[in-house]
């Protein structure tokens, strides 16, 4: 637990990171599904070694002639910088002086209550940024850094072309299960390491999901699923997401937006495996403070220190993360062109 700053030591910096991380991250479907594993690293770059093993059928040889030769792994090293996301806030005397406490008819506002509300807002801003960044990694295959301080395309970095499947949901004769089977087979073939896939999830735009459940070959199945599971259509979490299990795939409607722009483009759906270790990874690097040099990174940090002339208290926060698709080939883009 951080020690509250003593005003007898006006230049002391107080670490409120622990208090910040106690506030739960309740934002986002990707967080709820646990798609990304998290790992703290001690540097502001990550180095990834790509190892390819080629298998070959052996040919028969005449005894005594030169034998078949085994091929070793091929290795490639890739280094990626971790973007920096700072966020500051301030507590001013007028935030406390003469103010009524929230939810009270007469009690005066307290500094601790103001600080708590600001910490909660800071936490949510970092959480929503992380969710949007993870979704960008899935939909675009790139890292989130809107000011281009860092630029990484996971498909280009690993020389991979993303598989795409047109579901043609506007065509009544489309075999949706066959489309799904094509995607399932492709994902299983590209997992490569022998891990067992516990499920395939499709994160769908509202447009894709609505067309899916209205498609002639799916409509009756969805009616049956909805009526047996939940009369109001089964929804996840806070009730924002409709879901539908069909043909071995769990289709989930994702309605996340930022400034009116959907995080999943209209008519798109993104298919990915669940239960596979180290498939999707978020790396957190340490805060830009001397006391955190060469320490493993946390999800976010916040520090408090006095401002100029005793007129404000500064809350300085930051997060440093990169969302990596360790095997970008297992994310399949589905879409409907009609």
Question: Each predicted region: which residue ranges?
Answer:
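A contiguous, surface-oriented mixed alpha/beta subdomain in the mid-to-C-terminal portion of proteins
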Residues: 166-262
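A general structural signal for short secondary-structure junctions and capping/turn motifs
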Residues: 38, 190-195, 304-307, 323
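Assembly/oligomerization interface modules of large self-assembling protein complexes
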Residues: 34-101
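Short, Φ-rich (hydrophobic/aromatic) sequence segments
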Residues: 20, 179-187, 280-281, 290-291, ...
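N-terminal alpha-helical "arm" segments
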Residues: 1-45, 324-338
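Long, contiguous amphipathic alpha-helices that act as assembly "spine/axial" helices in icosahedral shell
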Residues: 85-160, 175, 179, 185-210, ...
């Amino acid at each position: 637990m951080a020690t509250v700053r003593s005003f007898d030591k006006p230049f002391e910096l107080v670490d409120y990171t622990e208090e910040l991380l106690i506030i739960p991250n309740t934002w986002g479907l990707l967080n709820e599904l646990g798609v990304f594993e998290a790992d703290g690293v001690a540097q502001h770059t990550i180095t990834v070694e790509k190892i390819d093993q080629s298998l070959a059928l052996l040919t028969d040889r005449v005894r005594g002639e030169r034998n078949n030769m085994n091929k070793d792994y091929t290795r490639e090293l890739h280094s990626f910088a971790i973007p920096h996301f700072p966020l500051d806030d301030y507590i001013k005397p007028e935030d406390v002086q003469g103010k009524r406490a929230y939810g009270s008819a007469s009690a005066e506002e307290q500094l601790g209550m103001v600080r708590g509300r600001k910490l909660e807002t800071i936490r949510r801003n970092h959480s929503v940024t992380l969710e949007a960044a993870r979704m960008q990694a899935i939909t675009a295959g790139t890292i989130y850094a809107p000011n281009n301080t860092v630029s990484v395309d996971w498909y280009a970095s690993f020389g991979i072309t993303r598989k795409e499947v047109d579901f043609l949901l506007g065509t009544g004769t489309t075999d949706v299960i066959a489309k799904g089977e094509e995607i399932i087979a492709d994902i299983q073939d590209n997992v490569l390491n022998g891990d067992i896939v516990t499920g395939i999830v499709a994160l769908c735009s509202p447009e894709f999901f609505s067309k899916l459940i209205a498609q002639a070959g799916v409509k009756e199945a969805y009616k049956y699923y909805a009526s047996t599971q939940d009369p109001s259509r089964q929804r996840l979490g806070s009730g924002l997401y409709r879901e539908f299990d069909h043909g071995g795939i769990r289709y989930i409607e994702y309605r996340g937006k930022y400034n009116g722009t959907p995080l999943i483009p209209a008519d798109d759906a993104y298919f990915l495996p669940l239960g596979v270790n180290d498939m999707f990874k978020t790396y957190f690097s340490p805060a830009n403070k001397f006391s955190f040099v060469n320490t493993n990174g946390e999800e976010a940090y916040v520090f408090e220190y006095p401002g100029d002339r005793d007129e404000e208290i500064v809350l300085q926060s930051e997060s440093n993360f990169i969302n990596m698709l360790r095997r970008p080939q297992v994310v399949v883009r589905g879409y409907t062109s009609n």
